[in-house]
């Protein structure tokens, strides 16, 4: 069988994206973001995001095909994010993808957006070794997964019990007065600060809680501790050392993620850790994981920044895996699932 060509379409949140992947080669990748429209509200407004998807869908898909010098007739299948995500946003992408699949008589795969973050690393690093672990870190998810077969079988090793890592950063960013999205601002300030200036807790790493939840994550306590420290400093009339706050927060979160990921690798005998999701663009986390991975003899695969955030390439790459593995395409009338479980790879 020749290398399958898949058109991937993404619309789970505030990015409308389309890409064409052939085998393990990225042919085209187009992203249109509505982030600027949400910035003044301090977060994503679902109705605005849905309308932006409707406006950007056709231009994105058209450009992705044009950049690949292809038409719909050239692709072997269409893959689209069916969940998890914002229901209205998912509906736009899925309905558009279904229309294309029907018009061109192509098979369609409604895929799990989060698992796409795992699959996309194949574009940069190639196939997954046996017993690969994946750390997914984003605004909505912080999970450790065992990848037995990215097209057929994934197990959840650990997940967040409250706030995800990206969510924690966004909330602290608001306290510091940073505009949305706050994560990149914390990242930049953290590079200038002292990571040991402020004592920030490391949730679920010690005592009974750490033993009961060795691979789970909790960042609500981190957010609360930093918030209280800031409030105390303000009450005492002290100037907030923003760089140090950001550095201490980033170091605490990165340390927890790296420690639990390495513990998982040891448990499963994995020598490869895949990292994905928008938060994996954080420079402190990338450095910490590479450092700890080298000490433990674990190859850490973190994709380039443009493949960390939401994109169509990740959707198309997972679609390629599904086609190659002979997974049955989704039914034409499959539904979106805004709370799609991580163990469900496709509809």
From Swiss-Prot:
- List the GO terms this entry assigns under cellular component, sorted alphabetically: cytoplasm
Q: Which GO terms describe its molecular function?
A: iron ion binding; N(6)-L-threonylcarbamoyladenine synthase activity
Q: Cofactor(s) for this protein?
A: Fe(2+)
Which UniProt keyword terms apply here? Answer: Acyltransferase, Cytoplasm, Iron, Metal-binding, Transferase, tRNA processing
Q: What gene is this protein translated from?
A: tsaD
Q: This protein is called what?
A: tRNA N6-adenosine threonylcarbamoyltransferase
Where is it located? Cytoplasm
Q: Per the UniProt entry, what is one GO biological process?
A: tRNA threonylcarbamoyladenosine modification
The record's section on Pfam families has: TsaD (PF00814)
UniProt xrefs under InterPro entries: ATPase_NBD, Gcp-like_dom, KAE1/TsaD, TsaD
